[in-house]
């Protein structure tokens, strides 16, 4: 679920903290990617028609492999250096949310059977997507694929979003990419949405800057975490009747959930019984993450390994895979060359060129005015 309604809340109240970027603008950047979220998107979108999905000869789904392979190549061709982060064991506080998701999938599965029997194609299309679940096998398949491609894989001890945020805070990567907004709540300095969008449409990447988010909302990081808990997160229920705008107003007015609870109209708002908001806050502030991450390395692809895994084991077209491997090799050479050039060339700050240009403009205008004065207004 992520943080309920946070994107709209930020668009309405902190628009300067968000900006659209071209995919290619992240050339040379290391990006930590929430792998499970990406796999889920691929399973829903790639090669799906109604209930039918891409499979190998054994009938095993391969949509996740097709999506991960193609998207990663596109990232590499754009000069982006992806790091895929996989979920570990979820926190105990997430069990209730996971149970809700399981129940929803069960309901969708039952509704899907009825839709199939009724021949309702639209309902089948919609409900089949709701039954999708990322399995351990899907994760293992993608880890193997990425390692064969020479792309680093990080296995988080717990939440992938928290691990991604930690990598970003420790300057191991430039930004975090996911569709769930949790990474901002975990304190990722830069967060990207739509980087991994699997649709054919070229959707711009939306970049969020957490420092600007706090500045625009006029909140501290602790207050922002409390705001996210009030909006609704994966770790506990929220207070019914309090949406994003009301939550923001209350946090600005009272400063913390404790103070809000002391002043809240109990007749109007029902506070969840034994509400574990403090534990949720602790999970956002002190998540279980890897303290000493090994050096992230991008290596040449294992050509034989890729052909064996994709072509022999999963029925991919050998000619296409061979061409894709050449793309990977070419992209990695291009990305490496770009890094070397940026290393040897001095990079000016963003403000410096603007100041120089402004000075240059003023000088030009002054020279033009001086020339006009000397000309004495003579007509030609």
Swiss-Prot record:
Region feature Disordered, mapped onto this chain: 351-380
GO molecular function per UniProt: 5'-3' exonuclease activity; 5'-flap endonuclease activity; DNA binding; magnesium ion binding
SUPFAM superfamilies xref list: 5' to 3' exonuclease, C-terminal subdomain, PIN domain-like
Cofactor binding, note field: Binds 2 magnesium ions per subunit. They probably participate in the reaction catalyzed by the enzyme. May bind an additional third magnesium ion after substrate binding.
Maturation and modification: Phosphorylated. Phosphorylation upon DNA damage induces relocalization to the nuclear plasma.
Gene3D superfamilies, per the entry: 5' to 3' exonuclease, C-terminal subdomain (1.10.150.20), 5'-nuclease (3.40.50.1010)
PROSITE patterns (alphabetical): XPG_1 (PS00841), XPG_2 (PS00842)
Protein name: Flap endonuclease 1-A
Source organism (scientific name): Sorghum bicolor
